[in-house]
């Protein structure tokens, strides 16, 4: 990538918003969150509706870099989220962030494998939170994207496991969409992939602004039915 392209990418208004401080989104780190516009999925439960459908952002990467200059010794990390952050070319921005001494966490649905691999090959990402949206048989129903994208997600999952990268897996659960058997199917797949790490089950967050206008389900996930028979996978619960 040449310098003029780098400058052009840094000055595109693709940052929907910036959360200046978080101690929750990147464990053991004080971070800011960069929310990237647009997404390649349309999950009904997604509460970032405005970000997902945004064609442009309010800020540029250059604006964020200026902000980071004022946060040295106050923050130590940057979280890239969305939307789907990897819909955008992140290389030049991540290089600048790393050069300033910050770590980078990526939140991703994993279907842009090629770009994720590019970032990892350049050592630009320190940690990944990978969304396992649903088993293959429910992937299209949950994400409103092609089932072919499930295989792209699996390519990312397998690659992260094979290179022993530091990452977590998470699934958002709305009980009208996913049930106990679906979660156990995901756990079976993770066991077959020889995943060793944290698996977060995130309870649906009821907001006024989700894509499918769905409400809290009257059904409940029976946590006792979740198979916890693999000591290598550490199941944790959020918002339960």
Predicted regions and their residues:
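Auxiliary Fe-S-binding modules of radical SAM enzymes
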Residues: 1-24, 173-240
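N-terminal [4Fe-4S]-dependent radical SAM core
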Residues: 1-35, 42-53, 71-72
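Electropositive phosphate-/nucleotide-binding environments in soluble metabolic enzymes
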Residues: 33, 37, 58-61
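A secondary-structure boundary/capping signal
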Residues: 35, 81-82
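Hydrophobic adenine-recognition pocket in adenosine-nucleotide-binding enzymes
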Residues: 39, 85
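Conserved alpha-helical substructure of the radical SAM core
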Residues: 49-79
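Flexible, glycine- and charge-enriched loops at secondary-structure boundaries
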Residues: 54-61, 146, 150, 216-219
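Conserved AdoMet/S-adenosylmethionine-binding subsite of the radical SAM
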Residues: 66-76, 86-216
